[in-house]
């Protein structure tokens, strides 16, 4: 994932020559990036890019190109909006909110695509009982795919953020722009739908 047009080169780094360490905190990386340290921003990309891509590719139904585009645009928005980030949420939550919005925009422009078997392989364990974690045959994947495809967009997003990315309810609410009470409702309805569809596998 690249940071997109407008990212400064190393020679254009901030006036104080700030360089963030590899183990720098998010807050330190943001401070350095605001001063023009492109390496600090690249550390942010390296730190959160893989998580954002994993979330995006499953959210958009397994389209790697759409997921990559959503992540790319999210980081471009993040770079351009560094000064607007006030730290009211964590950096991770802010970035996930950006990639979620970009993914939503992409899906509005295109017809919904089904979740692919490849995207579901890593989701089977969270979705079924422990006794079925080793039953990864085609029929199970097909049924889980169909169940996830039936979930409304917000329910699917909430489920992925909670069950796959292990976000807190508060983080999910901030990423989706809804209160925690709504997050609980989305997860409850999504889990109930999945449980009903997957009941014969229990």
Regions found by a protein language model. Give the residues of each.
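Amphipathic, Lys/Arg- and hydrophobic-enriched alpha-helical face
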Residues: 45-64, 81, 148, 193, ...
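Arg/Lys-rich amphipathic alpha helix in sigma70-family domain 2
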Residues: 80-87, 97-117, 137, 198-200
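N-terminal module of bacterial RNA polymerase sigma factors
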Residues: 1-51, 125, 149, 196
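Internal acidic/polar
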Residues: 14-15, 19-26, 113-141, 168
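Structural recognition of an alpha-helix C-terminal capping motif at a helix-to-coil junction
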Residues: 69-76, 89-101, 185
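Sigma70-family region 2
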Residues: 34-35, 58-62, 73-90, 109-111
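Short, charged helix-capping/linker segments at alpha-helix termini
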Residues: 19, 34-43, 54-73, 180, ...
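DNA-recognition helix of helix-turn-helix
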Residues: 100, 104, 144, 155, ...
């Amino acid at each position: 994932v690249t940071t997109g047009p407008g990212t400064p080169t190393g020679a254009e780094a901030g006036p104080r020559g700030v360089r963030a360490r590899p183990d720098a905190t998010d807050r330190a990386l943001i401070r350095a990036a605001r001063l023009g340290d492109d390496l600090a921003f690249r550390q942010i990309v390296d730190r959160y890019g893989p998580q954002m891509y994993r979330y995006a590719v499953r959210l958009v139904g397994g389209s790697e190109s759409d997921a990559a585009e959503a992540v790319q645009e999210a980081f471009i928005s993040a770079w351009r909006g560094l000064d607007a980030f006030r730290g009211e949420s964590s950096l991770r939550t802010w970035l996930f909110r950006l990639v979620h919005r970009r993914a939503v925009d992409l899906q509005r422009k295109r017809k919904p695509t089904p979740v692919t078997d490849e995207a579901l392989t890593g989701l089977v364990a969270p979705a079924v009982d422990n006794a079925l974690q080793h039953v990864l045959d085609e029929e199970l994947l097909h049924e889980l795919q169909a169940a996830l495809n039936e979930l409304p967009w917000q329910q699917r997003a909430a489920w992925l953020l909670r069950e796959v990315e292990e976000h807190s309810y508060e983080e999910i609410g901030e990423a989706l722009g809804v209160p925690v009470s709504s997050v609980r409702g989305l997860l409850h309805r999504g889990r109930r739908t999945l449980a009903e569809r997957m009941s014969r596998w229990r």
